[in-house]
Regions:
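Bacterial N-terminal signal peptides that target proteins for export
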Residues: 1-8
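Bacterial N-terminal signal peptides
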Residues: 8-17
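Boundary at the C-terminal end of the N-terminal hydrophobic targeting segment
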Residues: 20-22
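Predominantly five- to eight-bladed beta-propeller fold
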Residues: 24-26, 78, 156-202, 214
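Multi-bladed beta-propeller domains
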Residues: 26-49, 73-75, 81-99, 122-138, ...
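Conserved beta-propeller blade repeats
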Residues: 47-62, 95-112, 129, 136-154, ...
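Short glycine/acidic-enriched loop and turn motifs that connect beta-strands
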Residues: 68-72, 158-161
Length: 229
């Protein structure tokens, strides 16, 4: 692993100590008894939904993301799990009520992931958690360079090229002034664009980074199907 990344992880542990967790219900795997062979809404919501999965560099482990949902709480919870490549020794890594996602291998012993809009790392047993970023804008995706000296961070920045901002004297107005096409993506209006930021990995963590599409009206990755790839 890159030396700066190792130093940053150690420094983060010394500075943060124990991270306080929000007092929220920790939604996990549901135990449901099927009384018939009918597929019911309750049965569907009780099922975990597997997201991304990645094999370790040596091919011995697989880490993957699972989404669990609670009808009572009216929300979901994304968790990370790890298992041997043969499917044995499956283990839950996420212990917080906050979601953890977008997991990736840094080496055979270290994982990087997102939680609460920030980039973190941890060991493959779930210990040694370190926060690498302190971004004012939530991080939505990331990809480390092969030498681990730089990382691409995906952040959404405000964009009003097609939907104009509300006038200062009408800040709570719900009407919209649309002046161009591409003002909506499927289920949401385009008031922000995803931009890739190239950041350096230093001994103090990961810096803010440089927006390589600064001032441009484009988005990368592109909604709704674009990803960090």
């Amino acid at each position: 692993m890159n030396r700066n990344l190792t130093v940053a992880m150690t420094a983060a542990l010394m500075m943060t100590g124990t991270v306080s967790q929000a007092q929220e219900v920790n939604i996990g795997r549901s135990n449901i008894t099927l009384k018939s062979d009918l597929m019911t809404p309750e049965a569907l919501w009780a099922m975990g939904r597997i997201g991304s999965a990645q094999a370790s560099p040596d091919g011995k482990k697989i880490v993957y993301q699972v989404g669990y949902y609670s009808v009572k709480e009216n929300r979901g919870h994304q968790v990370l799990r790890i298992m041997d490549a043969d499917g044995k020794n499956d283990k839950l890594l996420t212990t917080s009520a906050k979601s953890e996602s977008d997991v990736a291998w840094l080496d055979n012993q270290t994982l990087a992931f997102l939680t609460d809009g920030q980039l973190w790392t941890m060991s493959t047993d779930g210990s040694n958690r370190h926060q690498l970023t302190h971004s004012d804008i939530a991080i939505e995706g990331f990809r480390f360079s092969p030498d681990k000296k730089r990382v691409v961070l995906v952040k959404s920045i405000p964009y009003h090229g097609t939907i104009k901002e509300n006038p200062d004297d009408l800040p709570k107005a719900t009407g919209m002034l649309i002046t161009d096409m591409n003002y909506r993506h499927w289920d949401h209006y385009v008031t922000s664009n995803a931009h890739p930021f190239v950041a350096n990995v230093t001994a103090n963590g990961v810096d803010v980074g440089k927006d390589i599409l600064e001032g441009e009206p484009y988005e990368s990755p592109m909604a709704p199907f674009g990803g960090i790839e």
